[in-house]
Curated annotation (Swiss-Prot):
Protein name: Phosphate import ATP-binding protein PstB
Source organism phylogeny: Archaea, Thermoproteota, Thermoprotei, Thermoproteales, Thermoproteaceae
Subcellular location: Cell membrane
CDD domains assigned: ABC_PstB_phosphate_transporter
Broad class of enzyme this protein falls into: translocase
The UniProt record lists the keyword Nucleotidyltransferase: no
Taxonomy, superkingdom: Archaea
């Protein structure tokens, strides 16, 4: 079953076309990797899924994006972003806030919890799901900026998970991490997909091969090929895909 669907999705900034008639189905409780060279439209597509693209007034969008069959452009945007959370290439916790408050803040601002006890339980649950609890449970009052880069990224995952989202969008989340923390985050994604849908933007074909169930290869704003990961990597149908997965196209 498709969790997210894009139909004839087009996007431009002024006279520059960034997405050119994208059609894509993201299956529920899978990891779908969006891969392709820089400038192919991967991160832009991700930002359309939860309407972050609306932060750019010059962006013009046409076509459809559906979440469980519902038009996201007709949904309440706050509700949409609660259900479709996002993490970014550069970890972005609020550095001077405590580890606890970084996870708790969104819950409090959106009045999702009704008591201190419930808040504490939700924060702990999110940190446990992000595989960070054991590392920070004795210093929850410490500033988030004191965490390592890998820990900060997992804190951002915990912050997203606190909302109990259905979809997690991840925009090159390991680009600034060392191999050890990259492996931790990839392992985390494999665990999280049991309960949610993950869309991962990556510049690294090897990462897509390691963690994704499906891949979509984008080139110059168009989807060239989409399919099960193993099939796309071992038997690509398009010459451009073959060049990309073998390192001949950057």
């Amino acid at each position: 079953m498709a969790k997210l669907t894009a139909r004839d999705l087009k996007l431009s900034f002024g006279n520059v076309e960034v997405l050119k008639g994208v059609n894509l189905e993201i299956k529920e409780r899978t990891i779908t990797a969006l891969m392709g060279p820089s400038g192919s439209g991967k991160s832009t597509l991700l930002r359309v899924f939860n309407r972050l693209i609306e932060l750019y007034p010059e962006a013009r969008v046409s076509g459809e994006v559906l979440l469980d069959g519902q038009d996201v452009f007709k949904m309440d945007v706050i509700e949409l972003r609660r259900r479709v959370q996002m993490i970014f290439q550069i970890p972005n916790p609020i550095p001077n806030l405590s580890i606890f408050e970084n996870v708790a803040l969104g819950l409090k601002l959106n009045r999702i919890v009704k008591s201190k006890k419930e808040l504490e339980a939700r924060v702990r649950q999110a940190l446990e799901k992000a595989q960070l609890w054991d590392e920070v449970k004795n210093r929850l009052d410490a500033p988030a900026g004191k965490l390592s880069g890998g820990q900060q990224q997992r804190l951002c995952v915990a912050r997203a998970l606190a909302f109990d989202p259905e979809v997690l969008l991840a925009d090159e989340p390991t680009a600034n991490l060392d191999p050890e923390n990259t492996a931790k985050l990839e392992s985390l994604f494999l665990e999280l997909k049991k309960d949610m849908t993950i869309v991962l933007v990556t510049h690294f074909p090897a990462q897509a091969a390691r963690v994704s169930d499906y891949v979509a290869f984008l080139y110059k704003g168009q989807i060239v090929e989409v399919g099960p990961t193993k099939e796309v990597f071992t038997n690509p149908r398009h010459e451009l895909t073959e060049k990309y997965v073998t390192g001949k196209l950057y």
